[in-house]
Amino acid sequence: MAENLKGCSVCCKSSWNQLQDLCRLAKLSCPALGISKRNLYDFEVEYLCDYKKIREQEYYLVKWRGYPDSESTWEPRQNLKCVRILKQFHKDLERELLRRHHRSKTPRHLDPSLANYLVQKAKQRRALRRWEQELNAKRSHLGRITVENEVDLDGPPRAFVYINEYRVGEGITLNQVAVGCECQDCLWAPTGGCCPGASLHKFAYNDQGQVRLRAGLPIYECNSRCRCGYDCPNRVVQKGIRYDLCIFRTDDGRGWGVRTLEKIRKNSFVMEYVGEIITSEEAERRGQIYDRQGATYLFDLDYVEDVYTVDAAYYGNISHFVNHSCDPNLQVYNVFIDNLDERLPRIAFFATRTIRAGEELTFDYNMQVDPVDMESTRMDSNFGLAGLPGSPKKRVRIECKCGTESCRKYLF
């Protein structure tokens, strides 16, 4: 039995910091965790709980890492070397003073409710940092994820699991493609039209990896059976998110949102919408539950027929947090790579315009597609234009809060 377990590993339920705390509490050294006899009794500031000023001397109530709250002590400013923690403490203090009293001058003693708020804020920051670390440990894409909440005390969402690709539900099979292209150069010298041509469609990208098809047209990328390599210009969506993105708390009642930390060029791929693939019947059952929550995470895959739905409520990637806008900067495309079943496309977001660093990413939950000239879409004359993937399931009338000039007032 032991031999069968060699080389196996499991995820630890405790974070690195939590394990270090346990070692110090138990007075155990652990070289793997960086806890030795030399630093076992070192005191490290976990966060600051309170503040007071006596005869021009500043004091802080310090919560020490690895020690209970009852062991917190008042320390003079000169004893503390934690510049980052001190700076964040005063930033949070000033912001809350402005919110409560419309002034930012620090009092000599803090009101108990204000001190309690600062403790809760410090604990929230730790929880969000742990969540950020978990997200980055699970992501398989190049782009990093940061998390930010400067609005309220909400922490990480409960029961949400970050995934990088579809989670296939019971009774659903994703059939792998059997053949691939034989191209020497898929963009400039495609053999038989490459993978798009094999499906009687046109090549989707230019030499910069930007989509050049009209919205509503499918994208066929090269697959795992193709002769071309990783650098093939027809492999874009499958390479995953390449931009650094931030999950942030909105200040206008829209919950969490996503902003880009980098400039994104027009028509560039941004992210996929992933979640659980479930049948439409199961989606109807879950939808009745989500209705009471005002949820909009059910996304119909109705490229050719409404058979399957993507549910990103509990399993999803960063697209789970992207908000609606009636004037969005992201457009949805159906993408086919290793599975060519037209009932099960992958859902990809592309930029509709140049998006500045720091700008929020949005898509239209009730998207529509303009009519497209049939001859410009597919290579044969029997093509009937299939539409965009379905919007998140439209069940209840939800008020829109996007605030754009073209706002329709309701999501659905």
From Swiss-Prot:
<dbReference type="InterPro" id="IPR046341">
    <property type="entry name" value="SET_dom_sf"/>
</dbReference>
<feature type="binding site">
    <location>
        <position position="222"/>
    </location>
    <ligand>
        <name>Zn(2+) 3</name>
    </ligand>
</feature>
<feature type="binding site">
    <location>
        <position position="400"/>
    </location>
    <ligand>
        <name>Zn(2+) 4</name>
    </ligand>
</feature>
<keyword id="KW-0156">Chromatin regulator</keyword>
<dbReference type="GO" id="GO:0007623">
    <property type="term" value="P:circadian rhythm"/>
</dbReference>
<dbReference type="GO" id="GO:0140938">
    <property type="term" value="F:histone H3 methyltransferase activity"/>
</dbReference>
<comment type="function">
    <text>(Microbial infection) Plays a role in defense against mycobacterial infections. Methylates M.tuberculosis HupB on 'Lys-140', probably methylates HupB of M.bovis also. Methylation has an inhibitory effect on mycobacterial growth in the host. Macrophages expressing about 60% SUV39H1 are slightly more susceptible to M.bovis or M.tuberculosis infection. Chaetocin (an inhibitor of this enzyme) increases macrophage survival of M.tuberculosis. This protein inhibits biofilm formation by M.tuberculosis via 'Lys-140' trimethylation.</text>
</comment>
<dbReference type="GO" id="GO:0005652">
    <property type="term" value="C:nuclear lamina"/>
</dbReference>
<comment type="subunit">
    <text>(Microbial infection) Interacts with HTLV-1 Tax protein, leading to abrogate Tax transactivation of HTLV-1 LTR.</text>
</comment>
<feature type="binding site">
    <location>
        <position position="183"/>
    </location>
    <ligand>
        <name>Zn(2+) 1</name>
    </ligand>
</feature>
<dbReference type="GO" id="GO:0044725">
    <property type="term" value="P:epigenetic programming in the zygotic pronuclei"/>
</dbReference>
<dbReference type="GO" id="GO:0003682">
    <property type="term" value="F:chromatin binding"/>
</dbReference>
<keyword id="KW-0804">Transcription</keyword>
<dbReference type="GO" id="GO:0040014">
    <property type="term" value="P:regulation of multicellular organism growth"/>
</dbReference>
<keyword id="KW-0539">Nucleus</keyword>
<comment type="similarity">
    <text>Belongs to the class V-like SAM-binding methyltransferase superfamily. Histone-lysine methyltransferase family. Suvar3-9 subfamily.</text>
</comment>
<feature type="binding site">
    <location>
        <position position="402"/>
    </location>
    <ligand>
        <name>Zn(2+) 4</name>
    </ligand>
</feature>
<comment type="function">
    <text>Histone methyltransferase that specifically trimethylates 'Lys-9' of histone H3 using monomethylated H3 'Lys-9' as substrate. Also weakly methylates histone H1 (in vitro). H3 'Lys-9' trimethylation represents a specific tag for epigenetic transcriptional repression by recruiting HP1 (CBX1, CBX3 and/or CBX5) proteins to methylated histones. Mainly functions in heterochromatin regions, thereby playing a central role in the establishment of constitutive heterochromatin at pericentric and telomere regions.</text>
</comment>
<keyword id="KW-0862">Zinc</keyword>
<feature type="binding site">
    <location>
        <position position="326"/>
    </location>
    <ligand>
        <name>Zn(2+) 4</name>
    </ligand>
</feature>
<feature type="domain" description="Pre-SET">
    <location>
        <begin position="179"/>
        <end position="240"/>
    </location>
</feature>
<feature type="binding site">
    <location>
        <position position="407"/>
    </location>
    <ligand>
        <name>Zn(2+) 4</name>
    </ligand>
</feature>
<feature type="domain" description="Post-SET">
    <location>
        <begin position="396"/>
        <end position="412"/>
    </location>
</feature>
<feature type="binding site">
    <location>
        <position position="186"/>
    </location>
    <ligand>
        <name>Zn(2+) 3</name>
    </ligand>
</feature>
<dbReference type="GO" id="GO:0001835">
    <property type="term" value="P:blastocyst hatching"/>
</dbReference>
<dbReference type="GO" id="GO:0030500">
    <property type="term" value="P:regulation of bone mineralization"/>
</dbReference>
<dbReference type="GO" id="GO:0042149">
    <property type="term" value="P:cellular response to glucose starvation"/>
</dbReference>
<keyword id="KW-0479">Metal-binding</keyword>
<dbReference type="GO" id="GO:0071456">
    <property type="term" value="P:cellular response to hypoxia"/>
</dbReference>
<feature type="binding site">
    <location>
        <begin position="323"/>
        <end position="324"/>
    </location>
    <ligand>
        <name>S-adenosyl-L-methionine</name>
    </ligand>
</feature>
<feature type="binding site">
    <location>
        <position position="194"/>
    </location>
    <ligand>
        <name>Zn(2+) 1</name>
    </ligand>
</feature>
<feature type="region of interest" description="Mediates interaction with MECOM">
    <location>
        <begin position="255"/>
        <end position="377"/>
    </location>
</feature>
<keyword id="KW-0221">Differentiation</keyword>
<dbReference type="InterPro" id="IPR007728">
    <property type="entry name" value="Pre-SET_dom"/>
</dbReference>
<dbReference type="GO" id="GO:0045786">
    <property type="term" value="P:negative regulation of cell cycle"/>
</dbReference>
<dbReference type="GO" id="GO:0005654">
    <property type="term" value="C:nucleoplasm"/>
</dbReference>
<dbReference type="GO" id="GO:0140949">
    <property type="term" value="F:histone H3K9 trimethyltransferase activity"/>
</dbReference>
<dbReference type="GO" id="GO:0030154">
    <property type="term" value="P:cell differentiation"/>
</dbReference>
<dbReference type="GO" id="GO:0031410">
    <property type="term" value="C:cytoplasmic vesicle"/>
</dbReference>
<feature type="binding site">
    <location>
        <position position="181"/>
    </location>
    <ligand>
        <name>Zn(2+) 2</name>
    </ligand>
</feature>
<dbReference type="GO" id="GO:0000792">
    <property type="term" value="C:heterochromatin"/>
</dbReference>
<dbReference type="GO" id="GO:0005730">
    <property type="term" value="C:nucleolus"/>
</dbReference>
